A protein has these predicted regions:
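Immediate N-terminus of the mature polypeptide
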Residues: 1-168
């Protein structure tokens, strides 16, 4: 098979997709490196390729820390629904449904099932970028919420878990 940079780019995209949809939260593209080795004698026309997947790099003040990737699972899921008629942002109502809690400013104006049906993110499942995209798509297509957003926070007690908040 001939050496083509485009094939390496496609493989990089495949790996990013694989990691990002199987629990690796914030996988960094720059963690993937390909090294090509050429026979200096010119006898072997094949070019061996070495794939390196490095740990993530996180800046902590003056230091650059090397942090291994770990699979992160969804620990909790909360949905916050704002009533556009209310000028304050105090959530006064809540309901438990399908393993998560929906908070609202005032009485919830929407059927909770309409909200829960669109959430592809599930408690105890590994983080998945595709689940995040599906959830965004659902709420954007409803066209009843202005700026849906999804926030993931590393759990304080267990760094392998993510607490998820959806703002509608």
């Amino acid at each position: 098979e001939s050496f083509e940079v485009e094939k390496l780019n496609l493989e990089r995209e495949r790996l990013i997709d694989l990691f990002s949809n199987n629990g690796i939260y914030n996988f960094q593209q720059r963690s993937i490196r390909f090294k090509a080795f050429k026979d200096s004698t010119g006898l072997d026309k094949k070019i061996p390729i070495l794939l390196e997947i490095n740990n993530s790099k996180i800046r902590n003040q003056e230091l650059l820390l090397d942090v291994p990737y770990v699979i992160k699972k969804i620990n909790s899921l909360s949905v916050f629904v704002e009533n556009p008629e209310k000028s304050f942002r105090i959530f006064t109502d809540s309901i438990n449904i399908d393993g998560f809690k929906i908070f609202s400013t005032g009485n919830l104006k929407y059927n909770p099932k309409i909200i829960s049906n669109g959430i592809a993110i599930k408690k105890n499942n590994p983080y998945s970028l595709n689940d995040r995209k599906k959830t965004y798509k659902y709420f954007n297509e409803l066209q009843i919420f202005k700026y849906p957003s999804i926030v993931y926070r590393e759990n304080i007690k267990d760094s392998t878990k993510l607490d998820t908040e959806i703002y509608l």
